[in-house]
Amino acid sequence: MAKVAVINRDLKRRKIVKKFEARRAELLATINDASVSDEDRHSARIKLQMLPRNASPVRLRNRCSLTGRPRGVYSKFGLGRGKLRDIAMSGEIPGMIKASW
């Protein structure tokens, strides 16, 4: 299981990304718009750089919601492969059965 501090750090980053999502989208639209003057685009670039680094969605990591495991996470369920198997085998996920061929 991942350390509690690492899990909390990821949750904090998710909250910050959500908070600045609209502002980042607005600035990026201004930067990528060719019809806007170069001065306005430059000022938008400076404002984007002034935002917190944790506001960038690139810094997020998909983690298991139960254990905090960073790898082997199925995004459809938000669970790591080990916990997904345990829960599926106990029949807690409707319609999920063990593969057999």
UniProtKB/Swiss-Prot annotation:
Keywords: Ribonucleoprotein, Ribosomal protein, RNA-binding, rRNA-binding. The keyword ATP-binding does not apply. It comes from the Bacteria. InterPro entries: Ribosomal_uS14 (IPR001209), Ribosomal_uS14_bac/plastid (IPR023036). The keyword RNA-binding applies. GO terms for molecular function: rRNA binding; structural constituent of ribosome. Belongs to the universal ribosomal protein uS14 family. NCBIfam families: PRK08881.1 (NF006477). Part of the 30S ribosomal subunit. Contacts proteins S3 and S10. Binds 16S rRNA, required for the assembly of 30S particles and may also be responsible for determining the conformation of the 16S rRNA at the A site. This is Small ribosomal subunit protein uS14. It comes from Nitrosospira multiformis (strain ATCC 25196 / NCIMB 11849 / C 71).
